[in-house]
Structure formats: C-alpha cells, structure tokens
C-alpha cells in the first residue's frame, strides 16, 4: 500500500517538510482556496503539483473535487455543474494526478457533535453523540417535523439534553455541526442550512441514487480518457441526517454504484471509519467483496455505542478488524500486481487524536500531526507484518 497524508495546502499548519518526516510518500490534497462552483484552472493544479514534488513527495490523490448541491438534487443547474466537475477532473488527469476521491452527501459533509472529547488515553477525539445531534435538529434548528425522523425515546433524551445546555453549549454544538469541517462543506448559518435542507424536499433515496448514477455515467468516461481512478467516499456517518437521503452507506449501495458503470476507473474509497459507524457493515467482508474496485483507503477506527453514537478510537482498536481489512487489500494488491493491472492502493491514516502539545496548537479537527503519525506507524507495522506472511505463503506454494 502507498502511504499518503492529507494536506490542506499552504494554510495547513503542518508543512510538507513535516509530512515527509512521517514516512509517507504521497500527498492527498485539493485546491480548497478555489470557490465551489468554479472549475480548477490548469495552472493552479500545476502549481500545487510542483510545490508537492519540490518537497520530495507525490500528489497521489485529489480529495476532493467539490460536488455542487445541484448535482445531488438533479435540478436544472446540474448539467452545468457536472460540466465544471468534468473539466476539473480532466485537468487533474492530464496533470498526472492518478486518483480522485469525492462524496455525494447532501447539505452537510462529514459531521461530528464534539471535536474535543476526552478519550481513555486522555487525548482528545472526535465524537458523534446521537442525543446531541437530535437536540440540535429538533430543538435548536427546529426543522419542521424533525421529531418524526427519530425514535420517540431518543427525542425525549434529546429534549432533556437540550434543557441542560447553556447558550454557550448550544452555540458550540451548532458550530461543530454546521460550521464546516476540514475538506467538507462550506460554513453555514442556521438560516442557510435550513434553506439548503428545504431545497431537497421531495427527493427520496431512490431519486438521489438515480442522480448519482446519472452523474457517474457522465464522468467515468472522462476518468477513463485521462487515466484517473475515481473513489467515492461513503456517507459519514452512514445514516440519514436532517431527514435527508444518504446513498453511499451500505454494501448494497456500493453494488449499485459499481454496477452502474462497470469500469476499474469507477471505484470506491474504503473508509473504515465511515462504514464502521454502522454496526451492520462487515468491513472485512466488504474489503474482500469490493477489493478490485478499492481505489483509495481511509484507515480509521470507531467504537459504536448502543444508541448509534460513536467516537473515533485508536487506529487498531474500535469495532473494525483493521488487520483483516488490511490483509484483504494487500492480497488484492499482490494478485493484481502479478497480472500487471495496477500499482499499490493509496491509503492514509484517517484522522488522529489530539495528543501531547498538539492539544494546545492550532490544528484542523481530526487532522492532528502527532495522532495521525502515531496511527500511520501502527498501520505500517501491520502492513509490514502481513506482507512478510504473504511472501512466506508464496515461497511455500
């Protein structure tokens, strides 16, 4: 597997020099400075690529080309938005960026309710607290008929939680949910997010999935033409938020996506932390079933609680059998390498706890330096161990 590291460009407090010191050889980045709704200029792509290569690294994955809401709604503005997306994709491919990760989450991107939750090791982790999210949706945002989307017992707990919140706690919860996490959706206000949610009225899961599959039929031929492998990122968390449909959450969703356009360029980002936030997703089985179409891997672990709340655990702890997932991907790599079909799958340590003096530094939520480097070291140890075992198996065969 190719070790990579997410970097948010020149505004990232972590420098490319420090990225190189982690042992990663690839960079995962995007042109976050360019406004959504604008195709990325070829010269800006070339500038970013040159900057990365000057640091002795490679631009291995673009994460992500922004996905305009009109594409997800399939409205009258969608064709122009898809054309802009295709222009950016084409320019990335012609510049030599081999993988593009993207997502299809409506309105909000990856979402957490607490960005500084104390883990058992006293570091700080990201957490999604179900009662807090429902408290925001029902009692702070006051979305129409929001309570109908949740179990009555959960709404009752959320009401109790809301009654205990100070105004400052309510404001912090709102910022955590809608203020825009790194690489995700733009900063929203209470009014703007309510309007965006309302713009999806009447769009159910079947319609949303149809819009995604129509998008794929437009963009995959471009990806094939310029040699880019696409990897759709799962919904995070993989269940409905604000009553909105989410269509990249389960193995059945993946099968629909991959069968819509049968091409190695139409693949997935296997994010174990996102898929793992649903207890009914068997991550090892998914890694085995979809291995040939895994074009990018995010290796992260979560612990899911009885009510669906979850927190980001250490990379080798939590609910995911990380060793089993990595073994499945390494077996796929060796099989396809022998057949000459592709090179190593890029992977990155997805998120990390705030540890040591990172706790007091400016960091992008989830994207600490020490925590991710710790995770990368642990994952590297697993990879090296499994690779040696696979070599022994081959030698004995």
Curated annotation (Swiss-Prot):
Gene3D superfamilies: Divalent-metal-dependent TIM barrel enzymes. Its EC number is 4.2.1.8. It catalyses: D-mannonate = 2-dehydro-3-deoxy-D-gluconate + H2O. Pathway: Carbohydrate metabolism; pentose and glucuronate interconversion. Pfam families: UxuA. The keyword Iron applies. Keywords: Iron, Lyase, Manganese. Signal peptide: none annotated. One of its GO terms (biological process) is D-glucuronate catabolic process. Disulfide bonds: none annotated. HAMAP family: UxuA. Belongs to the mannonate dehydratase family. Catalyzes the dehydration of D-mannonate. PANTHER family: MANNONATE DEHYDRATASE. This is Mannonate dehydratase 2. It comes from Agrobacterium fabrum (strain C58 / ATCC 33970). The gene is uxuA2.
